[in-house]
Amino acid sequence: FATAAQGARLVKHLTSSTYNYKNGNGITPLELLSDSSLSRGSTYWQCVDSKSCSWTIRFNNPIYLTRLSYFHGRFTNNLHMMTSAPKSIAVYVKLAKSNPAPLEKTLKDLASENVGKDNTFKKDSSYILISNYEYDIHDRRIRQDFPLPDWYIQLKPLIRSIAFVVNQNNGNSEFTSLRKYVINGVTASDLKIIDSNEFTIN
């Protein structure tokens, strides 16, 4: 769901600025919404923030999250690309208005219990932190999954928007490089079709 083709849109005021120094590559955060991570020669967005680098999108239709991943290549001859890779990533969600009224309070309470009291996005307090993840550049897997917390899965919230915040990269003090967040989920209409058995596989 993190593609422009599926209707996702960048929330610009909740996304960090682009690194525009003379050595910048000119890639914007919109590139992360591309259908193909290989659509351009250099597909890494360089975020001006070495800490608290945020990338926020809004879905075309609210979704139930099922899986999150991040993809970053391995470069033996490009130290900057590896030191600027994300290390610690916080994930925040914004609920859809169609959720039952008490669910927002429940989400906040569970977040407080599981991730701590400081659980709202500094740029917009309507986004709630659900977990912190580590991306390991020493792992051979270039795509690494971020499992959703059990308490979040059981709550089944319908979300309208999601924010990824890189709180730490691998040592680069000038910028953070990002290639591709992968978001899997189902919409409410998808779920109705599945539950009603209207869609069958022969």
Give residue spans per PLM region:
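Predominantly extracellular/luminal regions of secreted and cell-surface proteins
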Residues: 1-30
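Short amphipathic alpha-helical molecular recognition features
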Residues: 2, 56-60, 83, 170-173
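Short, surface-exposed beta-strand/loop "edge" segments at domain boundaries and coil↔beta transitions
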Residues: 18-20, 65, 171-176
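Trp- and acidic/polar-enriched beta-sheet ligand-binding modules for extracellular glycan
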Residues: 26-34, 38-39, 47-51, 76-202
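Short beta-strands within extracellular/lumenal beta-sheet-rich domains
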Residues: 42-61
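A short beta-strand element within beta-rich, extracytoplasmic domains
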Residues: 61-79, 164
